[in-house]
Amino acid sequence: MPPSPLDDRVVVALSRPVRPQDLNLCLDSSYLGSASPGSGSHAPVLATAVVTLKAANLTYMPSSSGSARSLNCGCSSTSCCTVATYDKDHQAQTQAIAAGTATTAIGTSTTCPANQMVNNNENTGSVLSPSGGVGSPVSGTPKQLASIKIIYPNDLAKKMTKCSKSHLPSQGPVIIDCRPFMEYNKSHIQGAVHINCADKISRRRLQQGKITVLDLISCREGKDSFKRIFSKEIIVYDENTNEPSRVTPSQPLHIVLESLKREGKEPLVLKGGLSSFKQNHGNLCDNSLQLQECREVGGGASAASSMLPQSVPTTPDIENAELTPILPFLFLGNEQDAQDLDTMQRLNIGYVINVTTHLPLYHYEKGLFNYKRLPATDSNKQNLRQYFEEAFEFIEEAHQCGKGLLIHCQAGVSRSATIVIAYLMKHTRMTMTDAYKFVKGKRPIISPNLNFMGQLLEFEEDLNNGVTPRILTPKLMGMETVV
C-alpha cells in the first residue's frame, strides 16, 4: 500500500502573510534518482523533503501519523503568521519522479526538473518563478519595494512652488518624513508629516502588523479627513536614500513604504532624501524654533549648536518625558503625571482632562481636582474633533478660576497633544503648522497620528472660513514667542 500523502508534508511558518509565489522555494528530489523508472529499483521513496526558503522563522514539521499536523507559533493571535503547506503526490509517484512535480496546498502546481532543484546549502541557482517556470533567485528586498519609483528634488520643488503660487496647498503631494523625530524637529521639508516609527514602541507595532501608516487613515472618518490630499501623490523621504531597493527591512523608510504598498498606494521616494533636497531648495524647508531664533539674532550655526543639548538623543524618550508647561496655566503630560499629586499641587493644578477610555481619574475621591473625561482612543477610527469645544470650555474655566489644568492621555504624545494644538489654533492666529511647532518645541515627543492631523487640518479650514470662530481676546499668556 503506498504511503499516505500526509506522511510527506512540510509546513512552513512565516512571520507575516506572503504569497507562495513570493517564496524562493524548491524541493530537493535528488534522492529520487534511485527510484527512477530506468533504474529498475522499486525502493520506497523516503518521506523527507528539503526546502530552500529565504525567510526567517522556518519550522519543518513532517507528519508522521498520517493526519494533518497543526502549527502553533506560541502567540495568541490567529493571524500573526501564515502557514504554507507543500505536498508530494505519492499517488502519482512515477509522474512526479519524471517531471519533478510539486503541488501546493492552495491548488496550484509548478514543474521543476530534478537537475534544477536546489538544496538548503545553495544560495544561488535556479528556483521556481511565480509563473511556474524557472527564474532568478529572489533578492533580500521584498518585491513590492522593487517597483517603488523615485522623484528628484527639482521635480518636488516644482510641485511645491506651483501649489504655493496657485494658493492651493491642498492640491499638493502628501510628504512623509521617516527620519528620527529629533532630526525632523531640526529641519524638514515644508508641510511634511512626521511618521514616528523610529522609536521602539512604534517600530514594534508596525513590524508586528498592529498598525501601519495607512491603517491610521483607512477608516471612513480618516479617509474623509484626508480625501483632499490622499487622493494625490505620496512622497516619502529620509535623510539620504538614493535607491529604495537598497533599503534594509530595519529602516523606518522600508517599514513605511511596505505599509503604503500593502494598502495599494504608489508612493514615491525622494532621491537623496532631505540632504539632497536642502542643497538647492533650502527655502522650501522648515527649521526648528531654536534654529530660527538663532538666525534672527545673527548667531549663526555656532549659536544654534550652543543652544542645543551637547548630547541630543536620536529618538524621543517617550517613557521618561516630564510634565510639560505649554502655557503658564496649561500642562501636557502622561499617565504618570496624573498620578503625581505633589507635583500637581505644587503647580497649582486644579483641573484635569483625561483623554482616554480606560485610565482612572486619579485622586478623584480626594475632591482636590475638577475632572473631565474625553473617552477617546489613539486609533484610526477615533473622531477627536467632536470633543474640541468641550475641552476648550473646560480649559477656559480653569483659566478664569486662576487654576492650572493638566491634559493627559496614555503618553502625552497623540490625543492630548492634538487637543492642545487645536486650543492654540482657536485662541490665536496660528496655523496648524505653527501651533504644532510651538507645542513640539515645548514637548519634543508629541506626534499626533495621521487621522488626528487630518482633523486638525479640517479645523484650520473651518477657522479660516469663519465656520468656527476664533477667540482672540483676552490674549493668551505665554504666547509672546513669534512662531
UniProtKB/Swiss-Prot annotation:
Q: GO molecular-function annotation terms?
A: JUN kinase binding; MAP kinase phosphatase activity; MAP kinase tyrosine/serine/threonine phosphatase activity; mitogen-activated protein kinase p38 binding; protein serine/threonine phosphatase activity; protein tyrosine phosphatase activity; protein tyrosine/threonine phosphatase activity
What InterPro entries does its record include?
Answer: Dual-sp_phosphatase_cat-dom, MKP, Prot-tyrosine_phosphatase-like, Rhodanese-like_dom, Rhodanese-like_dom_sf, Tyr_Pase_AS, Tyr_Pase_dom, TYR_PHOSPHATASE_DUAL_dom
Region called Interaction with MAP kinases, residue ranges: 200-216
> EC number(s) per UniProt?
3.1.3.16, 3.1.3.48
UniProt subcellular location: Cytoplasm; Nucleus
Listed SUPFAM superfamilies: (Phosphotyrosine protein) phosphatases II (SSF52799), Rhodanese/Cell cycle control phosphatase (SSF52821)
Q: Which GO terms describe its cellular component?
A: cytosol; nucleoplasm
Rhodanese domain residues:
169-286
Q: Which cysteines bridge via disulfide bonds?
A: none
| UniProt catalytic activity | O-phospho-L-tyrosyl-[protein] + H2O = L-tyrosyl-[protein] + phosphate; O-phospho-L-seryl-[protein] + H2O = L-seryl-[protein] + phosphate; O-phospho-L-threonyl-[protein] + H2O = L-threonyl-[protein] + phosphate
Pfam families in the record:
DSPc, Rhodanese
Record keyword Hydrolase present: yes
Q: Provide the alphabetized UniProt keywords.
A: Cytoplasm, Hydrolase, Nucleus, Protein phosphatase
Q: Which GO terms describe its biological process?
A: negative regulation of epithelial cell migration; negative regulation of epithelial cell proliferation; negative regulation of epithelium regeneration; negative regulation of ERK1 and ERK2 cascade; negative regulation of JNK cascade; negative regulation of oligodendrocyte differentiation; negative regulation of p38MAPK cascade; negative regulation of respiratory burst involved in inflammatory response
User: In this protein, which residues make up the domain named Tyrosine-protein phosphatase?
Assistant: 322-465
Active site, UniProt feature: C409 (phosphocysteine intermediate)
Function description: Protein phosphatase involved in the inactivation of MAP kinases. Has a specificity for the MAPK11/MAPK12/MAPK13/MAPK14 subfamily. It preferably dephosphorylates p38.
Q: How does it assemble?
A: Monomer. Interacts with MAPK14.
Write down the PANTHER family for this protein, in alphabetical order: DUAL SPECIFICITY PROTEIN PHOSPHATASE (PTHR10159), DUAL SPECIFICITY PROTEIN PHOSPHATASE 10 (PTHR10159:SF299)
Q: What's this protein's family per the entry?
A: Belongs to the protein-tyrosine phosphatase family. Non-receptor class dual specificity subfamily.
Q: What is this protein called?
A: Dual specificity protein phosphatase 10
Organism from which the protein derives: Mus musculus (Mouse)
Q: What lineage does the source organism belong to? A: Eukaryota, Metazoa, Chordata, Craniata, Vertebrata
- Which gene underlies this protein? Dusp10
